[in-house]
Amino acid sequence: MPIITSLITLSNTTATEIVGGDNMPHQVTLHNTTKSSNEYVHIGPADMTLANSIHLDPGQTIQITLRPGDVLYGMSDPNGLEVGILDIQNND
């Protein structure tokens, strides 16, 4: 099982791909690395905006399962926040 870690800086105007698609389901852990109040990492599909997405509170960590072909995008409010990612992929 490949394990991929990354730290991605996000924009508040453009959705950034944070987890690419795979041909197998995979477990993804996301962490909003900021500790300051009212600074949120938003996640969603490619056409996401800050108004139509779910957010991670400062310091929050979540785990989700992505299905084959799913791609996850992120944005931040304010601009320039970082999201930590741990992607545990399954072998074919």
Task: Tell me what each language-model feature is.
Residues 20-35:
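A short, compositionally biased N-terminal segment around positions ~18-40 that is enriched
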Residues 91-92:
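Short acidic DE-rich linear segments
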